[in-house]
């Protein structure tokens, strides 16, 4: 029996423009590390349930070594509200909640942490915020972070383009 793609759940219809694979480049900085560049691939998918699946991988721009990964789920809790549930292999979990603004050409999400969990060996992360904008086939984001005694501040930004 051939696998068929289920219909997109109506609760996440406003998030449909995110579906697909995105690749691009970004840069990072934080007071405790040297600035760095990276390449990134993000995939949003769905299984017909009221959430999108999410997988992200980054590599160092200079030598291609793996840097970071995240996986999780993006849910629409109300027509203009979203929840992003994320797990990191560094021992961190995040629940982010925020505002979704959708228009004819794309969407914008403003998210803040409502909960951060960490394993006993994970570095201290106390707050994370994300601003994500989609216009046509271009996805941009910035990430703010409070960690290891530092206040909430800019950490990452990237521009990605849809490849499929």
From Swiss-Prot:
Alphabetized UniProt keyword annotations: Heme, Iron, Isomerase, Metal-binding
InterPro entries hit by this protein: Calycin, Nb(III)_bact/plant, Nitrobindin, PeroxynitIsom, THAP4-like_heme-bd
Reactions it catalyzes: peroxynitrite = nitrate
Span of the signal peptide: none
UniProt cross-references to SUPFAM superfamilies, sorted A to Z: Lipocalins (SSF50814)
Gene3D superfamilies to which the protein is assigned, alphabetical: 2.40.128.20
Function as written in the Swiss-Prot or TrEMBL entry: Heme-binding protein able to scavenge peroxynitrite and to protect free L-tyrosine against peroxynitrite-mediated nitration, by acting as a peroxynitrite isomerase that converts peroxynitrite to nitrate. Therefore, this protein likely plays a role in peroxynitrite sensing and in the detoxification of reactive nitrogen and oxygen species (RNS and ROS, respectively). Is able to bind nitric oxide (NO) in vitro, but may act as a sensor of peroxynitrite levels in vivo.
Entry protein name: Peroxynitrite isomerase 1
């Amino acid at each position: 029996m051939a696998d068929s793609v289920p219909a997109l759940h109506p609760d996440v219809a406003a998030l449909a423009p995110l579906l697909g694979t995105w690749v691009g480049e970004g840069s990072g900085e934080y007071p405790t590390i040297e600035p760095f560049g990276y390449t990134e691939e993000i995939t949003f998918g769905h299984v017909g349930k009221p959430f999108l699946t999410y997988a992200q991988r980054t590599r160092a721009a200079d030598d291609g070594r793996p840097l970071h990964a995240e996986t999780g789920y993006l849910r629409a809790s109300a027509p203009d509200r979203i929840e992003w549930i994320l797990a990191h292999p560094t021992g961190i979990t995040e629940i982010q909640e925020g505002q979704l603004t959708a228009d004819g050409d794309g969407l914008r999400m403003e998210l803040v942490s409502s909960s951060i969990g960490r394993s006993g060996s994970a570095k201290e992360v106390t707050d994370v915020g994300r601003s994500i904008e989609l216009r046509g086939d271009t996805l941009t984001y910035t990430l703010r972070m409070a960690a290891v005694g530092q206040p909430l501040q800019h950490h990452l930004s990237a521009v990605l383009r849809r490849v499929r």
